């Protein structure tokens, strides 16, 4: 899980999701997981 100021889609499988106030990227590739912080 990377914590970044700006989250971006890395590949075409990445999806940007808002979960209880935080913006996250979920993907089939575990290294692409990100969270805005």
UniProtKB/Swiss-Prot annotation:
InterPro entries: Ribosomal_bL36, Ribosomal_bL36_sp
Domain of life: Bacteria
GO MF entry, a single one: structural constituent of ribosome
Keywords of the record: Ribonucleoprotein, Ribosomal protein
GO BP: translation
GO cellular component terms attached to this protein's record: cytoplasm; ribonucleoprotein complex; ribosome
PROSITE patterns, sorted: RIBOSOMAL_L36
Pfam families on file: Ribosomal_L36
PANTHER family per the UniProt record, alphabetical: 50S RIBOSOMAL PROTEIN L36, CHLOROPLASTIC, LARGE RIBOSOMAL SUBUNIT PROTEIN BL36C
Family: Belongs to the bacterial ribosomal protein bL36 family.
Protein name per UniProt: Large ribosomal subunit protein bL36
Taxonomic classification: Bacteria, Pseudomonadati, Pseudomonadota, Gammaproteobacteria, Oceanospirillales
Gene from which this protein is expressed: rpmJ
């Amino acid at each position: 899980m990377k914590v970044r100021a700006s989250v971006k889609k890395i590949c075409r499988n990445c999806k940007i999701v808002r979960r209880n106030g935080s913006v996250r990227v979920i993907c089939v590739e575990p290294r692409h997981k990100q969270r805005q912080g």
